[in-house]
Amino acid sequence: MRDSIYLLWIDNRLVVIIMMVMMVSCRCVLGLENINPIFFDEGLSHLFGEGNLIRSPDDRSVRLLLDKYTGSGFISSSMYQHGFFSSLIKLPGAYTAGIVVAFYTSNGDVFVKDHDELDIEFLGNLEGKPWRFQTNMYGNGSTNRGREERYRLWFDPSKEFHRYSILWTPTKIIFWVDDVPIREILRKEEMNGDYPQKPMSLYATIWDASSWATSGGKFGVDYTFSPFVSEFKDIALDGCNVSDSFPGENNNNNIGNYNNINCSVSDQFLMSNDYSTISPKQATAMRRFRERYMYYSYCYDTIRYSVPPPECVIVTAEKNRFRDTGRLKFGGSHPKVHKARKKRRRNRSTPVVSADL
């Protein structure tokens, strides 16, 4: 965008045409491998943690720090009625027990009693033990009906950047890790208000969750290892920008009129993109991921829900691996692997869940 504005000084008419062609062509091919990142000041704002949010000189990336004084976070400058939210993220290394790094959408600041939320939350661990993460969904303040799933990763998220994405449309929600869809929620009529329906902002935060994040609160944040640094770059926001329909500094007061906004064109664009459709290869990758790396699912937690929530798709092969608590029967974070089978796979260099696109 900045290069385009600069070129306007050369030939106004010609460059406007080029800009329009480029915008159309980029949107047509937009997918997980071709995402349009924004500059921080084009769509994001500082949320909290004075001094602990550090922007890069090129304004394409940002570091969020946690120290003994405060965590930090940023928020999208606008609210969106459906959208695709994505970022390359690198997590802190070494001892990270008690830490949560979150990438999520929410409207809790506007709809205090009936907020919606979609979460990707990374849970820190003791040094030498892997990060874990969870996804969750709340609709219309249904916090007493949490829909969380917990997983491990097939890589070390503190060594290099990986892309994490949330797709939210009128009919489905998909959570992505790189090019692998890890969870799909299809909207059911029986869900009623439990499906997120109100405009949300994008958030990214790092904070002290010593009371629950690691082993149920057994291990907390050790600030002798601080500062803890998480990094976000090539952040993408695509969706129906509701805030633009209510200009002014206090436009959140008018967001309640969101039903009057027509987002059909934006929704159609979202639902026609690559990241809204799970290919057969990606479906296989998702199944493998869930078989090997998911260690808790609310859909199989029959103590919590005697009848699974309506959006749950009960997969017999998955269900047989879980206790009635929703956790794996084997007591670990993944099923045991027979030695012979493990030996055959020892020389594999590609991740078993890669969509191989």
Curated annotation (Swiss-Prot):
InterPro entries: Beta-glucanase/XTH, ConA-like_dom_sf, GH16, XET_C, XTH. Residues 32-232 form the GH16 domain. It is found in: Secreted, Cell wall; Secreted, Extracellular space, Apoplast. The active site is at 117 (nucleophile), 121 (proton donor). Disulfide bonds join 299-312. Contains at least one intrachain disulfide bond essential for its enzymatic activity. Xyloglucan binds at residues 121, 134-136, 144-148, 211-212, 216, 304. Its EC number is 2.4.1.207. One of its GO terms (molecular function) is polysaccharide binding. It catalyses: breaks a beta-(1->4) bond in the backbone of a xyloglucan and transfers the xyloglucanyl segment on to O-4 of the non-reducing terminal glucose residue of an acceptor, which can be a xyloglucan or an oligosaccharide of xyloglucan. The record marks 119 as: Important for catalytic activity. PROSITE patterns: GH16_2 (PS51762). PANTHER family: XYLOGLUCAN ENDOTRANSGLUCOSYLASE/HYDROLASE PROTEIN 8-RELATED. Belongs to the glycosyl hydrolase 16 family. XTH group 3 subfamily. Catalyzes xyloglucan endohydrolysis (XEH) and/or endotransglycosylation (XET). Cleaves and religates xyloglucan polymers, an essential constituent of the primary cell wall, and thereby participates in cell wall construction of growing tissues. This is Probable xyloglucan endotransglucosylase/hydrolase protein 29. It comes from Arabidopsis thaliana. The lineage of its organism: Eukaryota, Viridiplantae, Streptophyta, Embryophyta, Tracheophyta. The gene is XTH29.
